[in-house]
Amino acid sequence: MCGIFAYMNYRVPKTRKEIFETLIRGLQRLEYRGYDSAGVAIDGNNHEVKERHIHLVKKKGKVKALDEELYKQDSMDLKVEFETHFGIAHTRWATHGVPNVVNSHPQRSDKDNEFVVIHNGIITNYKDLRKFLESKGYEFESETDTETIAKLIKYVFDNRETEDITFSTLVERVIQQLEGAFALVFKSIHYPGEAVATRRGSPLLIGVRSKYKLSTEQIPVLYRTCTIENVKNICKTRLKRLDSSTCLHAVGDKAVEFFFASDASAIIEHTNRVIFLEDDDIAAVADGKLSIHRVKRSASDDPSRAIQTLQMELQQIMKGNFSAFMQKEIFEQPESVFNTMRGRVNFETNTVLLGGLKDHLKEIRRCRRLIVIGCGTSYHAAVATRQVLEELTELPVMVELASDFLDRNTPVFRDDVCFFISQSGETADTLLALRYCKDRGALTVGITNTVGSSISRETDCGVHINAGPEIGVASTKAYTSQFISLVMFGLMMSEDRISLQTRRQEIIRGLRSLPELIKEVLSLDEKIHDLALELYTQRSLLVMGRGYNYATCLEGALKIKEITYMHSEGILAGELKHGPLALVDKQMPVIMVIMKDPCFAKCQNALQQVTARQGRPIILCSKDDTESSKFAYKTIELPHTVDCLQGILSVIPLQLLSFHLAVLRGYDVDFPRNLAKSVTVE
């Protein structure tokens, strides 16, 4: 995930070297988010405030390489002191364009660096904006979506209706043209000593530090009275006059520092006093005064933004509070699941809209069959949702491993709709299966976590799961987001089915409560760690279930294989008597997933067979399930949700168990041997 860090010192004298060090330290605190290049933008050699130019330094690779590059800049005097200065810094995780210096951030508006911007997120309509700007004579040098933002603000500035237009007004007009998710921080030679930041769908917070009293603890949110529909329209209205009652500043126009970051870990060493921006907030700092405004007012808007105190210690923030990316990603699932649904599920009207599919919805509804194709964890997400897709779409659903699908030369027809699931969007077998289906005239749908990937480009339409970059090789949050994306597709397909409305409403209510239920499951981490202490010396492990939880068993067993190097097998409980029962004895650890769903009675039969062979089952069950717990060696009790979503809650204990087993066995959780995050060869 891209990392944003920016630093403004107002009436706080700092040398260029000190500013560099602050920016680099901020980026180092964001390294755990993952990145492939880094860059900074600072004021040029002339220290007169009104005559500055912007100097960019960017480097592919680690922040350390950028740090070394900064000190090679012969044209910059590191001893020059700035009383007021604004510097921005960025770590980039490539989404549009390969990792290189040109594609790195900050991105610039032109060769004179009139405007520079750093960006975390994805602009989905950047191609249309780029085409428009190119038609106006603006030349692009990178492949990024972010450069479109830099060029767009230059276009708005060049076509301004008045010379006294404010920096925040320019940004306001720009973001009204943007679609997608973003956190943005802008710097400009036309507005020296000023900063503007905004966000929509990506996190951004502002830290404030001053040894003087601050003007307020609650920053009022200001509004304009008009809305600009496109970049050519002119808004005649103005914001309320900025004064001590509408801005945050040090009383008496004294010294103050502001820190902008996508993560609190980059700020905490400087201050624990922060303001969390909300979606569509525009925060501007000018003359040491911070103001926040929004374009549109809604009834649910909070009228102010409070300064909050971070409850965090510096030593906690390496890789956030986590020892490994995988652990971090497991604990991010309340947020990643919410992000997958955000803007797509309307819980008030019980409607679902997947914007990437809406133009093809009629064609999809006319199809005769759905084919869902993936590898590894992505395949398991397809298995997990097959039953609910069949129920909601009333269509036959085939779930295929991409390699096997190709080996069989599976018949595919023009009235099929084929889904291709891949976290990276580059999985070789899945990509080959996509091309195979396209050649046969099927409609193709991509479900990926990477905008601009091969699968997202080559499919006819698709769903971006919005889970955020997943760095750990063993997939966790991508699985649950893929799961939810497929469920949302089924809900969208069944919207006009009167007979399914009660079921749809039940599932949508379940989706709404999922983030909180996931937090409840994550609170079992200590209990699962204690279980891992008993199991980590074992050589083999069986995971059994059926119905909606069969995929949970497959995925849980895969996680254990991937990072603990223990043999583990996910078994359909209905197949127990057809071979696997021979493995059961008092030494073999057996995990059983038994939930209060239509398969409950059949799972009880399997449980009896295991205990009859002196097996000691570890049971994942519902909180109110006293029947299963009677026969359990140990139980992990989970909150109950609608049956087709229970697999999201039941897989998380297995993710946590695999993590703790790997740590106890002394293995690198994030980089298991012989495995890569993105499998780009057959």
Curated annotation (Swiss-Prot):
Q: What does this protein do?
A: Controls the flux of glucose into the hexosamine pathway. Most likely involved in regulating the availability of precursors for N- and O-linked glycosylation of proteins.
Phosphoserine-modified residues are 244
Q: Which residues form the active site?
A: 2
One of its Pfam families is GATase_6
Annotated positions binding substrate: 377-378, 422-424, 427, 578
**UniProt KW keywords:** Aminotransferase, Glutamine amidotransferase, Phosphoprotein, Repeat, Transferase
| Name recorded for this polypeptide | Glutamine--fructose-6-phosphate aminotransferase [isomerizing] 2
Q: Which GO terms describe its biological process?
A: cellular response to leukemia inhibitory factor; fructose 6-phosphate metabolic process; protein N-linked glycosylation; UDP-N-acetylglucosamine biosynthetic process; UDP-N-acetylglucosamine metabolic process
Q: Which GO terms describe its molecular function?
A: carbohydrate derivative binding; glutamine-fructose-6-phosphate transaminase (isomerizing) activity
Q: Which NCBIfam families match?
A: glmS (TIGR01135), PRK00331.1 (NF001484)
Spell out the PROSITE patterns in the cross-references.
Answer: GATASE_TYPE_2, SIS
**Under which pathway is this protein filed?**
Nucleotide-sugar biosynthesis; UDP-N-acetyl-alpha-D-glucosamine biosynthesis; alpha-D-glucosamine 6-phosphate from D-fructose 6-phosphate: step 1/1
UniProt superkingdom: Eukaryota
Q: Which SUPFAM superfamilies match?
A: N-terminal nucleophile aminohydrolases (Ntn hydrolases), SIS domain
User: Domain Glutamine amidotransferase type-2: where?
Assistant: 2-288
Q: Which InterPro entries match?
A: GATase_2_dom, GFAT, GFAT_N, GlmS/AgaS_SIS, GlmS/FrlB_SIS, Ntn_hydrolases_N, SIS_dom, SIS_dom_sf
List the catalytic activities from the record: D-fructose 6-phosphate + L-glutamine = D-glucosamine 6-phosphate + L-glutamate
| Protein EC | 2.6.1.16
The chain positions of domain SIS read 360-499, 531-672
